[in-house]
């Protein structure tokens, strides 16, 4: 296998990554908190403690709004500090059987044994390694559309990733 991908690390990619990360954060954390809060609010309503039930639901709503606001502020701060906004960088990935090679200013090899997870966003793969590095592989960076499918199938086989395209 020798699949090549050229991903442009720029403002657009940063925004898409943050949107994906924020959505997954909200799904994981907010759903659990909402279910627990709704359970307590229902109990309070059954006990006819309407003001406490309303207060709990109000706190839940404020938490949701603050979480969204913090994510927007964090993204805005990051965009101000990121050199990729003014100087986009092309990162080339070459996926092989036992490793992938990452090339930008310098080149490095990443063994698949160090990969902890592979996730699929709507328009990129996100590869996370044990040394806490994240590699974003943009779907637009494949020369051949079949390469994206082949790479997804490879990830499914190698990591039991269950990626659907």
Regions found by a protein language model. Name each.
Residues 1-40:
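N-terminal membrane-targeting/pre-transmembrane regions
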Residues 126-165:
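A membrane-cytosol interface segment of integral membrane proteins
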Residues 94-95, 119-120, 129:
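Generic beta-strand structural signal
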Residues 100-101, 108-125:
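Phosphoinositide-dependent membrane-docking surfaces
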Residues 68-109:
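Conserved beta-hairpin
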Residues 39-62:
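Hydrophobic alpha-helical transmembrane segments
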């Amino acid at each position: 296998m020798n699949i090549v991908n050229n991903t442009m690390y720029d403002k657009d990619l940063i925004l898409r990554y943050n949107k994906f990360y924020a959505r997954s954060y909200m799904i994981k954390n907010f759903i659990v908190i909402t279910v627990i809060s709704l359970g307590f609010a229902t109990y309070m309503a059954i006990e006819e403690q309407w003001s406490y039930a309303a207060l709990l639901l109000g706190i839940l709503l404020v938490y949701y709004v603050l979480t969204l606001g913090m994510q927007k502020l964090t993204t805005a701060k990051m965009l101000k500090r990121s050199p990729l906004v003014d100087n986009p960088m092309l990162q080339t990935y070459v996926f092989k059987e036992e490793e992938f090679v990452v090339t930008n200013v310098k080149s490095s090899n990443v063994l698949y044994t160090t990969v902890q997870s592979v996730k699929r966003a709507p328009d990129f793969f996100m590869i996370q390694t044990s040394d806490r590095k994240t590699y974003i592989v943009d779907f637009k960076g494949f020369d051949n559309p079949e390469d994206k499918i082949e790479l997804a199938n490879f990830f499914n086989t190698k990591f039991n990733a269950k990626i659907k395209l």
